[in-house]
Amino acid sequence: MMYNASMKHYITGTRRGLGQALTDYLECVDNLEECDIFINCKHDGFSQVELLYEAAKLNKRIINIGSNSPDGIKTHPHIYAVQKSALDKANEQLFYQGVDTCVVRFGYIDTPRVERVDDKKMSVDYACQVIFWILRQPHRVKELTVCP
């Protein structure tokens, strides 16, 4: 599907951070059924995985906001990393079934949620630009990892 700016987007997690910023740039609708492109942005347990499968059944173009958190070995229980890893695997499975789905595995994005993290962070605007780059690609992009 060739991207054009008039396409309708359904974005989860629009109250703050990246999801909120994306709504400033993209034409949005209030539900999955009406959209052309689903941006799966809100982390809420395993719900991102469930929404990914729902969007795939509706033949939507999908961008999942993942994390580089599943990378590496954790020395303590880290459910967030497990949930984001499940999103990675579901994306991979559906991609190879022909679904136009991509997972963007960001490192820290400079939002209030991670204001106390003392690590390098990318700007929200830069993260938006990464998503726009994916949208403009003429071919499917399976995954992309971006760390500051």
Predicted features along the sequence, with ranges:
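NAD(P)-cofactor binding segment of oxidoreductase domains
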Residues: 38-62
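C-terminal helical subdomain
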Residues: 116-148
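N-terminal Rossmann NAD(P)H-binding glycine-rich loop of SDR-like oxidoreductase domains
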Residues: 9-25
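Catalytic loop of short-chain dehydrogenase/reductase
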Residues: 61-96, 107-114
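Structural signature of the Rossmann-like NAD(P)-dependent dehydrogenase/reductase core
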Residues: 11-12, 39-41, 61-67, 102-105
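Short acidic low-complexity segments
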Residues: 27-36
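Conserved Rossmann-fold SDR core element
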Residues: 95-109, 140-143
